Design a protein with these regions (language model features):
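Short-chain dehydrogenase/reductase
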Residues: 105, 109, 157-169, 199-207, ...
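SDR active-site strand-loop-helix element
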Residues: 34, 59, 84-90, 127-133, ...
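Active-site Tyr-X1-5-Lys
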Residues: 114, 156-189, 205-221
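Conserved Rossmann-fold NAD(P)-dependent oxidoreductase catalytic core, especially the SDR/UDP-sugar
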Residues: 113-159, 184, 197
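C-terminal substrate-binding subdomain of Rossmann-fold SDR/epimerase-dehydratase oxidoreductases
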Residues: 20-21, 28, 35, 39, ...
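NAD(P)H-binding glycine-rich loop region in Rossmannoid oxidoreductase-like domains
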Residues: 69-109, 118-121, 133, 138
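Adenosine-cofactor binding site in Rossmann-like domains, unifying the SAM/SAH pocket
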Residues: 49-74
């Protein structure tokens, strides 16, 4: 068992803690963004660069396996970052969470253990951990305040992932309380944006909707060239554009995509909140640069807990409404159907963003503009990858 008490620059007397560690990062600070190629990590990277923080470090999964403790230690030994943004995680939609429960809890716990542990041992000044609002109970009072954490049962479909993320935020909280570290956890709502995951096997709700409706539109219009370009870029169950029309139709039909209709999971009734990923990045960088752990709880609290920060819009709409907006944006003339035999997930998920607002950040991009931006980004990506 590791004895942390004799390691790391966070071990300070009470009087030293905030004076020594709670300092603003300057533009020469070396910042490691774990997961810098992902949806949020890439947006955080770009946001930092745009603010003049250019001493950034990133590694692809091929270059650095965050599940490997030896490799992670070697990376920290060599790079000695001043700050860390932990945006790397094993993520997926309802189907993936149901089918690969062990992967979701094991891999996320291992990533967090390795990165947070080495950050402590190497005296990292500031760490920002990205979680998810799935940490809250299935029937949490709405909108969900940070204080709702661990008050009742979690949603079954993503329970392993949620437990891993709860462990991550509690690691940040506990290291900060015991050792005086400056580790903060932020819990974003449903995110979407550039570099999103559009693979039908494991994508989240909004990118999955956009791709399904787009492919159905192409089939409806008989545009097989567009269909083949799409699945050449992102094959579905190994099926790409070289296959026959019949094989492609059979495979897409498994995911509710036909020329006549798009069929989505559930009833469409659950209420959800969506935040543009570049705004999540802006909120994250705002917290990284301007908020310290001591700002996340009330002075004088005897029991300090729930120090994480919700990040969202504070606005919600039903999955059905989102789907209808996607259909309208893309211009699909077929039917939109719902398979009520499939799970809906949590009935309602809306964050209370009062703490975030009090810390000085508000969102700007609304859902209609976001859907338009994401669809344009998706189409542009297909075109770029098929230039002759």
């Amino acid at each position: 068992m590791t004895d942390y008490s004799s390691q790391g620059a966070c071990v300070l007397t009470t009087g030293q803690r905030y004076n020594n560690l709670y300092k603003m990062l300057d533009k020469n600070s070396k910042i490691y963004v774990a997961g810098h190629n992902g949806l949020v990590g890439s947006a955080i990277w770009n946001n930092l660069m745009g603010r003049g923080y250019t001493n950034l470090v990133g590694r692809s999964h091929k270059e650095l396996d965050l599940l490997d403790p030896v490799a992670v230690k070697k990376f920290f030994d060599e790079e000695q970052p001043d700050a860390v943004v932990l945006a790397a995680a094993h993520v997926g939609g309802i189907m993936a969470n149901l089918n690969y429960r062990a992967d979701f809890i094991y891999q996320n716990l291992q990533i967090q253990q390795n990165v947070i542990g080495e950050s402590y041992r190497h005296g990292v000044k500031k760490l920002l951990f990205l979680g998810s609002t799935c940490i809250y109970p299935r029937m949490a009072p709405q909108p969900m305040k940070e204080e709702a954490l661990l008050t009742s049962e979690l949603e079954y479909t993503n329970e392993p992932y949620a437990i891993a993320k709860i462990a991550g935020l509690k690691m940040c909280e506990s290291f900060s309380l015991q050792y005086g570290c400056n580790y903060i956890a932020v819990m974003p709502t449903n995110l979407y944006g550039p570099n999103d995951n559009f693979h039908l096997e494991n994508s989240h709700v909004l990118p999955a909707m956009i791709r399904k409706v787009y492919l159905a539109k192409c089939l409806n219009e008989g545009d097989w060239d567009a269909v083949r370009k799409d699945i050449n870029l992102r094959p579905v169950e190994g099926v790409d554009g070289s296959r026959s029309n019949e094989e492609i139709l059979t495979t897409l039909a498994k995911y509710g995509i036909t020329p006549e209709a798009v069929t989505l999971w559930g009833t469409g009734k659950p209420m959800r909140e969506f935040l543009w990923s570049e705004e999540m990045a802006d909120a994250s960088v705002h917290v990284l640069l301007n908020v310290d752990f001591k700002d996340t709880y009330k002075p004088g609290d005897k029991e300090i807990r729930n120090c994480h920060i919700n990040v969202g819009t504070g606005k919600e709409l039903s999955i059905r409404e989102v789907a209808e907006k996607v259909v309208a944006e893309i211009g699909f003339r077929g039917e939109l159907r719902w398979d009520a035999s499939k799970p809906d997930g949590t009935p309602r998920k809306l964050t209370d963003v009062t703490k975030l607002h009090n810390l000085g950040w508000h969102h700007k991009i609304e859902i209609d503009e976001g859907i338009h931006r994401l669809y344009e980004w998706y189409k542009k990506g297909i075109c770029i990858n098929h230039k002759s």
